Amino acid sequence: MILAANFKMNHTRASTKAYIERLNAYGKQTDIDIAVFPPATALDQYETFADIGAQNAYAAEHGSFTGEIGLQQLQEFGIETVLLGHSERRHIFYESQEMIARKFAFYKERGFTIYYCLGETLQTRKKGFEAIRELLQSQLEGIDTAYENFVIAYEPVWAIGTGVAAKPEEIEEVLAYLASLTDAPLLYGGSVKPANIKEVLSIPKCDGALIGTASWDVENFIKMIEIAKEMR
């Protein structure tokens, strides 16, 4: 079971440090892996059982890439996990599949654990599952689905940050399809919160959750870890 907290553009260095300290005080739970993705300004070499990852990184060690961080910056803090393909990177920052695949290849070559996001818009959802399947295939172009340090997070765009999670049967259908393509752990993301995480984690083929808004409060996140622990 994997529970990952994506801070997005939230938290500071001080509040991230306090968050990690609270997680450490709570302690590692058997059979539940925890990942935390702080903003770039809060990345550090924290003493923690949680896997600390970058929300984004450029496909280069260093160089003239204004506003980006690369391998050199991540290595300073011992970061070996990166989140790629998030819909906010795709739709707000116009990252192409070619760019995402290039990042994937770069960090795969360096053995990083890669959390890879994909998912459909509401417009595609309304067209039916065949359209969803075609979109997911396009979002896997150039991606090595057999990579051993690979985690997929299915995040329907219309459910991210809206408070409206996808229905269990909708999630199950997509995860079953993804499971036919890869042996990688499959997470669901999209308005996951304490009120629905048990239902989400009960879905066949669901190996965990990538959690946004509901994870920003550490007590909320711990509450979700507790629910997951009770289900083991």
UniProtKB/Swiss-Prot annotation:
A GO CC term attached to the entry: cytosol
Enzyme Commission designation: 5.3.1.1
Gene3D superfamilies: Aldolase class I
GO biological process: gluconeogenesis; glyceraldehyde-3-phosphate biosynthetic process; glycerol catabolic process; glycolytic process
Keywords of this entry: Cytoplasm, Gluconeogenesis, Glycolysis, Isomerase
Residues binding substrate: N6, F7, K8, G161, S191
Protein name per its UniProtKB record: Triosephosphate isomerase
Pathway(s) the chain acts in: Carbohydrate biosynthesis; gluconeogenesis; Carbohydrate degradation; glycolysis; D-glyceraldehyde 3-phosphate from glycerone phosphate: step 1/1
Record function comment: Involved in the gluconeogenesis. Catalyzes stereospecifically the conversion of dihydroxyacetone phosphate (DHAP) to D-glyceraldehyde-3-phosphate (G3P).
Places the protein is found: Cytoplasm
InterPro entries membership: Aldolase_TIM, TIM_sf, TrioseP_Isoase_bac/euk, Triosephosphate_isomerase, Triosephosphate_isomerase_AS
Entry annotation: catalytic residues: H86, E155
PROSITE patterns for the chain: TIM_1 (PS00171), TIM_2 (PS51440)
An MF annotation (GO) of this entry: triose-phosphate isomerase activity
Pfam family of the protein (one): TIM
Reactions mediated catalytically: D-glyceraldehyde 3-phosphate = dihydroxyacetone phosphate
Top EC group: isomerase
Quaternary structure and interacting proteins, as annotated: Homodimer.
Family label: Belongs to the triosephosphate isomerase family.
